[in-house]
């Protein structure tokens, strides 16, 4: 499971 959280 891959979680990507952008900081913008």
UniProtKB/Swiss-Prot annotation:
Sites of Pyrrolidone carboxylic acid modification: 1
Gene Ontology terms: biological process: flight behavior; neuropeptide signaling pathway
GO molecular function term, any single one: hormone activity
Cytoplasm among keywords: no
Keywords (A to Z) from UniProt: Amidation, Flight, Hormone, Neuropeptide, Pyrrolidone carboxylic acid, Secreted
Compartments (UniProt record): Secreted
The protein, known as: Adipokinetic hormone
């Amino acid at each position: 499971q891959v979680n990507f959280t952008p900081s913008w």
